Amino acid sequence: MKTALKIAYVGTNFYGSQAQPGLPTVESELRKALEEAGAIKLGTKIAMAGRTDAGVHALGQVVAFEQADPKLTAPRIINSKLPKDLWAYARAEVPDDFDPRRHATSREYRYILYAPDVIERRLKECSSRFLGTHDFTNFSSVEAGKYPVRTVTRLDIAKRGDFYIIDIEADSFLWNMVRKIVTALRLVGENKRPDGWIEKMFDPEYREGIPPAAPGGLYLSRVNYDGIAFEEDEYARQRAYQRMLNSFEWHHTIAEIYKEFKDAMK
């Protein structure tokens, strides 16, 4: 049997999820922690449900590996070896052939967009056009050999003050697909692109490059599977909650200072 873990991380200090020589990544820090805890043997492959780029976060990333000792794969044990911005909080026993990427039925991302000048009605009208099966060549960064057709099953937008909370679910995603969709939504919402532009962008013969939205607003919220039951580690969750509460208080204070400095410089 293998072990699957649900992990979360604040991606600000990581150079993405995949290992890169000489750089701090989610995979490299997790591997070091698992090896130090005795949960895996040296060189054991660690598979992830999805790749996240530098600066992108995750709340529901899933990793799987062949365990050396099941008792040592408990989230609370692994977390004692991890940096404070990366933690595990749930665990499942999975079959030897389980692949967290290939066996996922869908993935869900959330983007938190600060956009006080967006017209809410246009943003929400535009969002429905992404639903269904489309060619997302113009809404992704080109990867050689990647089939560009994807099916978006859900795209919800909720307003929270000057922020828009954008939730998107699909069978799978192309590189930078979510962040480029967010850019497109914003362009339409700010009246910088006309009606019908989204449909035009779905034509792979038409090419218009748009930049991806900033990575810091994006996180992988959930990966869905059939027949996999994760058991949450309540102690690990509570420790993570307390760390997040402390960080929230600090960053909320800094945000207020930035606001006062901004107002003073008007």
Swiss-Prot record:
It is an enzyme of class 5 (isomerase). GO terms for molecular function: RNA binding; tRNA pseudouridine(38-40) synthase activity. Its EC number is 5.4.99.12. The keyword tRNA processing applies. One of its GO terms (biological process) is tRNA pseudouridine synthesis. Keywords: Isomerase, tRNA processing. Coiled coil: none annotated. Substrate binds at Y109. It catalyses: uridine(38/39/40) in tRNA = pseudouridine(38/39/40) in tRNA. The active site is at D53. Belongs to the tRNA pseudouridine synthase TruA family. Formation of pseudouridine at positions 38, 39 and 40 in the anticodon stem and loop of transfer RNAs. This is tRNA pseudouridine synthase A. The gene is truA.
